[in-house]
Amino acid sequence: ALRSNMDYLITDENLIKKGEEKFYSEKLIYMPDIWNSLSKPKNLPEIDLNICKNNKTFTFGSLSNFQKISVETIKVWSNILNNTNSKLILKSSINNSNDLKKNLYEKFLKENVNPEKIEVFDRVENQKNHLEFYNKFNLTLDTFPYPGVTTSFESVLMGKPFLTMRGNNFNSRCGESININLGLKDFIATDENDYYEKALKFYKDSNKISKMGQQLREHALNSPLLDVKKFSKNFYDKLYEIYTSH
């Protein structure tokens, strides 16, 4: 149980799979497609494909909260960086994050990563500038065991697919559910070794990744991820079922 005073839990079939209901004291409310939906940002920047084309170095990126960058994540990311001619872009989600940035660099140094391969940016104050950061890299790397949610929605909206890890519970499967709803199962790794192998595969096929840009945005906009009207209707129907059952 998450909380003793919570009766229902909103989920989908990708987050809590059949047979796992017994692990929850709450009554599970399964949404038809996905447990969450995002409204299209008002100031959605253009996708700049030229940045990726002009980059001589393949660039990975993650705009997730630094707290989600686990020791396991750093080890796998370091392995990727140490075995490719690539770099990694990270961005803080809080102000005055110098100590956090220093701590991150130290963790990568312990894995023998050249610090010049990592760029860590400060928080930006408006959404448009934040979203424009996705134009700086080729592929988003998701964190694990706790993946990004909003940043994953943002990534595909900005034409950048994200590589995520298959989880073993609700919280660790959010990226999996998002990619399944987009039909991007190839971007779901089964374990740390598969994550590494997939990252190398996409690194070697950078042209394919770059070409996904505008098409991926349109696909996301027409998927359950951004269909807030359909999600609202489904959510209302679920609430009405709960109300009428009492």
Which ranges hold each PLM region?
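Conserved catalytic-core segment of nucleotide-activated headgroup transferases in glycan assembly
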Residues: 33-126, 133-135
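Short acidic loop-to-helix transition motifs that present clustered carboxylates
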Residues: 124-128, 147-148
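Active-site-proximal region of nucleotide-activated glycan assembly enzymes
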Residues: 1-43
